[in-house]
C-alpha cells in the first residue's frame, strides 16, 4: 500500500488543496541514481478511443487502496498500448558481474508505473526486466515464490497448452533463457540505442538468445491485431489502480496479478522480496492471415439481404465475437457498428444472459444466435455464463503487441503466408495455472466449454484453439441455413462449421517473473 501513517495524520491538518499538493508517497522502491534524460513531448503509447484509459498518478494517489506504483514495473498494469516494443531474451554467463551491474546500472534504467503514466515522466525508451526460474537460480535465488508452473517452465508444458513442440523456435526449447528485457518506445532507433546501452553495460555477462520486435499496426489499423480485429477492449479494472470503472468492466483484486497483494491466493506464503512482482507469460504466436482471409471468403454465411463479402465479414465476427471495429456481435449481431465499437462506455457493456433484443422467451444458456458459445471472446471471458466466483480468478492482464509486416500483395494474391507475422503475446498474473494455463487448456482448447450449454460439442476457440493442428468443428457460427431452393431460412444454431487448420500457431515462449524494483534490488544482492 502506498499510504503511510503520516499520510492519514496530514488529513487532519491540511486542507484538501494542500493535501493533494503535499501528500507524501510511501513506497518500498529502492533509491535510484537516474541520469537525467530528454523530456518527451509525445506519449510512447497508442490510445485507441475504444480502449479503457489509464489513470493519472494523481488519480491513483487519491484511491484509498492505492498500489505502490513507484515499486511496480511499468508493463504490468498498462495493457496493450505500446507503439513499438522489443523483447530481448538472454542467458546469464557471469552471475557475479551481472548482479553487480544490475544493481549499479540496470536498476536505474527500469521504468516504473508512476513514470509511464505521464508523457512528462516517460523515458525515451521504457525498460523492464523479468527472469525465468532457471534465471533466478543462476543468480543464486532459490526461494519458493509459490508457482509450480513457473518452476517447470513453458517448454515442459507445451503439450498441456496445446502446442506442438516440433514447431517451437529452438531458442525457446529447454530452459536456457534466463531473462528478458522489454524495451518500448516510439521508434526502433530509440529502442536499439537503449539496447546497445544495456549490452554495453552488461558486456560478456549475458548472451543474446532471441529477440522479437513488435509494433502497433500502421494508420487506421493501430490497435488491431493482424487478422484486423481491435484488441485489448476487455481488460479488467484493477482495484487500487483503476480510478474509473467503465460499464461492463470487471473490477478485480490486484492480487490476481501482483504477488502479495489483496486477492493473491498465496498472499501469506510469498517471500517479501517477491511482493508487487508478477508472473509474465510470453508466447510467440504466428498468425496465418492470408489463409484466414481465404477461409472467410470461401465460407460466407448465407444470410438474407447480405452480399457474400458481408457474409464473410459476419463469419469472422462470429468467430471472434466482435466485429473488426470492436463492436460485440452480441449487441450488433448482423452488421458492424463502428460507432458502438469506438465507444468505450458501450462496447464492453453486455452480459450473455441478457438478450440484446429482449425477448421473454429467450434464454441464452440455450441460444447462440446472437453470439456463438465458442466465439473467442466468449471462451476467454464468459460473462454471465459463469458466476463471478467461477470466472474472476482466471482474469489476466494482456500486454501483447503485433509483430511482423503487413500482408504483401503477393501473399494476398496467393492466399499463402510467406512472411512471419503474428502476436507477441504477453499476460500478467499472480498464478500461472489460474491464469494462462487454465484459460488455454480448460477453456480455449476444451470442445465442451462453455459448460452447461445444450450443444455437447461446442468446439475449441476458433481463433486460438487447437486440436493438434488438424480440422475441427465449431458449432453456432452459422445461425441460419437455407432449407429449400426458394431460400427460406431456419434457425440452426448447432450447425457445425469445419475449420480446416490452425490459423494461429505457437512457436514457443517462456514463463518469467517480473519483480518489483525492490525485488530487483534484492535479486542483485542475493
UniProtKB/Swiss-Prot annotation:
- EC number annotated for this UniProt entry: 1.11.1.19, 1.11.1.7
Coiled coil (UniProt feature):
none
| Bilayer-crossing regions | none
Q: What does UniProt give as the signal peptide span? A: 1-21
Q: Per the UniProt entry, how does temperature affect activity?
A: Thermostable. Retains 50%-90% of its activity after heating for 2 hours at 60 degrees Celsius, while no decrease in activity is observed within the same time at 30 or 40 degrees Celsius.
The protein's required cofactors: heme b
Binding residues annotated for heme, in chain numbering: 376
The family assignment reads:
Belongs to the DyP-type peroxidase family.
Q: What does this protein do?
A: Manganese-independent peroxidase that is able to convert a large number of compounds, but its physiological substrate is not known. In addition to classic peroxidase substrates (e.g. 2,6-dimethoxyphenol), oxidizes dyes such as Reactive Blue 5 and Reactive Black 5.
**What is the protein's name according to its record?**
Dye-decolorizing peroxidase
What organism, scientifically named, is this protein from?
Mycena epipterygia
Taxon lineage: Eukaryota, Fungi, Dikarya, Basidiomycota, Agaricomycotina
Amino acid at each position: 500500500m502506498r499510504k503511510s501513517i503520516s499520510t492519514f495524520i496530514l488529513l487532519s491538518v491540511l486542507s484538501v488543496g494542500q493535501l493533494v499538493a503535499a501528500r507524501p508517497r510511501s513506497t518500498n522502491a529502492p533509491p535510484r541514481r537516474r541520469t537525467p534524460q530528454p523530456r518527451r513531448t509525445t506519449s510512447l503509447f497508442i490510445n485507441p478511443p475504444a480502449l479503457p484509459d489509464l489513470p493519472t498518478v494523481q488519480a491513483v494517489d487519491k484511491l484509498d487502496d492505492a498500489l505502490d506504483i513507484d515499486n511496480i514495473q511499468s508493463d504490468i498494469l498498462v495493457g496493450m498500448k505500446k507503439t513499438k516494443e522489443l523483447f530481448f531474451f538472454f542467458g546469464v554467463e557471469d552471475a557475479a558481474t551481472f548482479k553487480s551491474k544490475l544493481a549499479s546500472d540496470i536498476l536505474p534504467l527500469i521504468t516504473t508505473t508512476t513514470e509511464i503514466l505521464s508523457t512528462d515522466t516517460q523515458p525515451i525508451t521504457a525498460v523492464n526486466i523479468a527472469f525465468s526460474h532457471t534465471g533466478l537460480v543462476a543468480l543464486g535465488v532459490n526461494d519458493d515464490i509459490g508457482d509450480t508452473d513457473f518452476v517447470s517452465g513453458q517448454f515442459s508444458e507445451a503439450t498441456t497448452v496445446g502446442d506442438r513442440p516440433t514447431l517451437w523456435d529452438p531458442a525457446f526449447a529447454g530452459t536456457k533463457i534466463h531473462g528478458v528485457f522489454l524495451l518500448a518506445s516510439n521508434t526502433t532507433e530509440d529502442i536499439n540505442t537503449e539496447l546497445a546501452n544495456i549490452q554495453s553495460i552488461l558486456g560478456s555477462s549475458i548472451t543474446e538468445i532471441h529477440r522479437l520486435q513488435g509494433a502497433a499496426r500502421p494508420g487506421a489499423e493501430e490497435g488491431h491485431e493482424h487478422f484486423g480485429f481491435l484488441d485489448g477492449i476487455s481488460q479488467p479494472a484493477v482495484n487500487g489502480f483503476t480510478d474509473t470503472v467503465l460499464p461492463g468492466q470487471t473490477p478485480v483484486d490486484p492480487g490476481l496479478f501482483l504477488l502479495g497483494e489483496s486477492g493473491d491466493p498465496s498472499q501469506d506464503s510469498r517471500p517479501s522480496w517477491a511482493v508487487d512482482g508478477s508472473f509474465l507469460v510470453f508466447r510467440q504466436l504466428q498468425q496465418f492471415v492470408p489463409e484466414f482471409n481465404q477461409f472467410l471468403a470461401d465460407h460466407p454465411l448465407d444470410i438474407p439481404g447480405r452480399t457474400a463479402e458481408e457474409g464473410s465479414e459476419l463469419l469472422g465476427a462470429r468467430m471472434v465475437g466482435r466485429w473488426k471495429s470492436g463492436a460485440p456481435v452480441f449487441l450488433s449481431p448482423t452488421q458492424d457498428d463502428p460507432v458502438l465499437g469506438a465507444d468505450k462506455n458501450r462496447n464492453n457493456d453486455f452480459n450473455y444472459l441478457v438478450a440484446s433484443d429482449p425477448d421473454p422467451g429467450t434464454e441464452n444458456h440455450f441460444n447462440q444466435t446472437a453470439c456463438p458459445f465458442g466465439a473467442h471472446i466468449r471462451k476467454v471471458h464468459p460473462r454471465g455464463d459463469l458466476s463471478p466466483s467461477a470466472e474472476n480468478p482466471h482474469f489476466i492482464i494482456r500486454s501483447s503487441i503485433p509483430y511482423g509486416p503487413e500482408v504483401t500483395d503477393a501473399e494476398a494474391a496467393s492466399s499463402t503466408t510467406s512472411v512471419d507475422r503474428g502476436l507477441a503475446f504477453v499476460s500478467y498474473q499472480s498464478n500461472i495455472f489460474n491464469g494462462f494455463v487454465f484459460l488455454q487448456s480448460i477453456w480455449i482448447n476444451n470442445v465442451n466449454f462453455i459448460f452447461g450449454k445444450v450443444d455437447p460439442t461446442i468446439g475449441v476457440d476458433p481463433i486460438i484453439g487447437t486440436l493438434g493442428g488438424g480440422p475441427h468443428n465449431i458449432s453456432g457460427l452459422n445461425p441460419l441455413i437455407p432449407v429449400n431452393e426458394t431460400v427460406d431460412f431456419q434457425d440452426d444454431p448447432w450447425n457445425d462449421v469445419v475449420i480446416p487448420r490452425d490459423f494461429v500457431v505457437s512457436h514457443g515462449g517462456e514463463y518469467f517473473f517480473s519483480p518489483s524494483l525492490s525485488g530487483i534490488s534484492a535479486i542483485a544482492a542475493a
